Amino acid sequence: MIREATEADATACAEIYAPYVTDTVISFETEPPKPDEMAERIAKAQRSHAWLVLEDDEGRVAGYAYGGPFSGRPSYRWSCEVSIYLELGRRRTGGGRALYQALLDTLAARGFRNFCAGMVLPNDASAGLHRALGFEPVGTYRRIGYKHGAWRDVAWVQLCLPALTGSPTEPR
């Protein structure tokens, strides 16, 4: 089941995210956020964009996806940066694709028109997921971050919804 996250999901989301921070280069954070910080992130995303969770058959949070501002400048307000994290053993089961699509649908219904995501290279799973959902490559920052003893490249992909005529309505 996919649903809107609440601050009560913070511990589960923090537990899912921690190995991405400590054991991989997928996240450029170096210290995993504690549940109280994750609760603040959830609340902030819910106020401005969206944060969804994927529950397994037992009702346990098995993944999450969220959108946030692409930039703080006003003319970017219809554009989002999006991210998804699943329990490491849950990848390639179809749940991630359904969760991410639900996030994109939620954000589109709220008036957002452009979705951007960055991924540390190489990351075949993320590249494949984004490609399957219609994202297109827009560029790569070379050696932009240093983690686990090496400089890392970050590729950016973008999904643009069809252009609207006239002035867009404000995202909500």
Model feature map: region roles:
Residues 1-13:
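A short beta-loop-alpha structural element at the N-terminal edge
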Residues 14-41:
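Conserved GNAT-fold acetyl-CoA-binding loop/helix
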Residues 32-89, 100-101, 160-162:
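Acetyl-CoA-dependent GNAT
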Residues 66-69, 116-119, 131, 136-153, ...:
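Conserved catalytic-core motifs of GNAT/GCN5-like acyltransferases
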Residues 91, 117-127:
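Conserved beta-strand-loop-alpha-helix junction that forms the acyl-donor binding cleft
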Residues 92-105, 128-132:
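Conserved acetyl-CoA-binding loop-helix of GNAT-fold acetyltransferases
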Residues 107-119:
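Conserved GNAT acetyl-CoA-binding A-motif
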Residues 163-172:
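Acidic/histidine-enriched, glycine/proline-rich intrinsically disordered or flexible terminal extensions
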